[in-house]
């Protein structure tokens, strides 16, 4: 499965459809990249805000998941996004796990253009999911 090979370790069809690539994942940090296609743009020719929110969701959740490889997913409990600039061209993202509880992860991250322009920032809380123990 494409996403598993790209570093997600789980199959997420929507993320695969977008073409998100994980560049680095481990120790609470995730770096990713999206090379947008025309169908991911808004009516002004910028990357759609929903796509940017998805990138941040993936980066923040994946950063948390990278702290515990036994978890098999993460659910978004809450996420706050600040949009700062329009995204034109490739988008680079970074997510960082800030604090890990027993089942919740608190993460932050940002998206930047290739020239380093800050596009968006986010914070979020995620519930880690684990395989059933069979009980």
Predicted regions and their residues:
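Terminal targeting signals and extreme-terminal segments of soluble enzymes
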Residues: 1-135
